[in-house]
Amino acid sequence: LTLIYVTHDQVEALTFAEEVVVMTRGKAVQVGSAEALFERPAHTFVGHFIGSPGMNFLPTQAVGGDLSVQGQAVQVPQGLALPEGDLKLGIRPEYLAVSEVAEAGTLAASVRQVQDIGTYQMVTCDVAGVMLKVRLAPQTQAPQVGAQVFLRVLGPHTCFYKNEELVA
């Protein structure tokens, strides 16, 4: 039995459906399982719509083998082919990691807010004017509000978008 159920509620859609069609502006932008929609959103709308909070996005420029993310230089990971020009880097709050030390693949950030949600903590960080949400792993010590930290933005769950569509 095939059933088409229309909803604007992501939780409802992901709970009832084996396969979800996500539409925006009258166009289907991704069809897939809940896991596929969450892990590799094919469109920035899907990344924002699926998940709570939605995916973080950072304006990024790719030039040569380097990235400029909010004015900070980040080297493109080995083997990752990105189109030149303006991109968006997308990463979910669950996959961002906070460090006190600058490392490859990190961006400098300032902690603006720490929320204790009960089972986890949500940290809001400012990366050159763009606010990012970081969901801390259980038992992780939260940084203090005002602290300068580094966010690991490059990893296996990082997505890159050009013209709102997934390119890497």
Describe these PLM feature segments.
Residues L1-V6, D9-T15, E35-A36:
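Conserved H-loop
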Residues E19, V31-G32, R40:
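Short, glycine/charged-rich "phosphate-handling" switch motifs in NTP-dependent
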Residues P53-F57, G65-A168:
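Non-catalytic connector elements of ABC transporters
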